[in-house]
Amino acid sequence: MRKLNPALEFRDFIQVLKDEDDLIEITEEIDPNLEVGAIMRKAYESHLPAPLFKNLKGASKDLFSILGCPAGLRSKEKGDHGRIAHHLGLDPKTTIKEIIDYLLECKEKEPLPPITVPVSSAPCKTHILSEEKIHLQSLPTPYLHVSDGGKYLQTYGMWILQTPDKKWTNWSIARGMVVDDKHITGLVIKPQHIRQIADSWAAIGKANEIPFALCFGVPPAAILVSSMPIPEGVSESDYVGAILGESVPVVKCETNDLMVPATSEMVFEGTLSLTDTHLEGPFGEMHGYVFKSQGHPCPLYTVKAMSYRDNAILPVSNPGLCTDETHTLIGSLVATEAKELAIESGLPILDAFMPYEAQALWLILKVDLKGLQALKTTPEEFCKKVGDIYFRTKVGFIVHEIILVADDIDIFNFKEVIWAYVTRHTPVADQMAFDDVTSFPLAPFVSQSSRSKTMKGGKCVTNCIFRQQYERSFDYITCNFEKGYPKGLVDKVNENWKRYGYK
């Protein structure tokens, strides 16, 4: 029997989830109009198995089933970050800290560019539709939230764009809404790389004929990396190869020269226009809101060809209150880049994380106190240095508050983070504002305020390290069970717990 490779093969990923009892195959007819979304939200919020909708109302034989919650959390007994771990081919019990550190280790590996395979070895080419045969509105595309502006086909697929000189190929995730039978509209915003590449076409007079591909069911490692804010000019495909330890098989598109993962479930291709726009949104996003009737003109994608596998499967993310892919992937992957940036910048940072409970708006940095004291700096100087490093780079684009904590805090435990936050900083006095940096337009307090016109500021660094800790060790007792009593006594209590009468 062939060994499953869930990081490279999307269908192997699904099989692994099934083998681990982390998949519910729903054969009852389900309506893609809100019912799919409702089931997904309940599964996310209860850390339940991923739903595979095999009988969607309005679906044809091969187009399509839906896999929901592909990177949602699951029960701790199964490894709560198991689905994310499987995206990388790691043990399902791998912790999020270990996942972040593994991604950093992979950056030291030799990049492996994709390998071109013949059409006969590309399952995504099983069925091919030309432009006149494409009817996007006939697909069972989910309408995910009440008051969304439309049906969102693209929530967990991968856009592929390439600069005109072909030196930089970008794989990325950005939402996409069906407009009509031939068109999709979606976010193409600065400073995201998809916009930078689109602008490079505009610079040569081709703003309305930018080649694109939109791929679904790509290698899970690829969809994970496409969420990362990696440096400008770096092609994600080579880094994916380093993670996998092998090159991603790719095949040429039907209507342009872009190369797409050969095992993709579905591939839509055509041209993007920055000059032709359509109202996009609103959409229930990563911060947990749909703001009714608040759409915006966005660039238009014209679909000119479509290819797909037998019994194609569409992976779907349904953003909202934590925890879903916009937190588990985007948040943790930004944290990975944040930790690397700290290392490159010489900051005494031990770990970085974006706690899910903060809806991907907070970045927590765990500071090595001995390293901090060696800098002979002040809280004010250090906060400014940290803010200048992060808020002026793409890594800090979605972040609105950076929180500095001491090295006694487990930043992957939100209970400890919020304890440090509320007890170790004085509001305003220990917060340094950065009013000249770019705001994140999707943050609700930006989009629903006058700041939406300037797109500046609303960001700060919060110092949750006691001032004296910048100069010397500062002893205090944490008043909890694990840290507040001698280890021998803690062990004794744990050993005798059932004898005391507890279960």
UniProtKB/Swiss-Prot annotation:
Record-annotated residues binding prenylated FMN?
A: 170-175, 192-193, 236, 394
Offer one example of a GO biological process linked to this entry: ferulate metabolic process
- EC identifiers of the protein: 4.1.1.102
Q: How does activity depend on pH?
A: Optimum pH is 7-8.
Cofactor binding note from Swiss-Prot or TrEMBL = Binds 1 prenylated FMN per subunit.
Subunit details: Homodimer. May form higher order oligomers.
Any further remark recorded for this protein:
Present with 861 molecules/cell in log phase SD medium.
The protein depicted here goes by the name Ferulic acid decarboxylase 1
Instruction: Provide the gene name from the record.
Output: FDC1
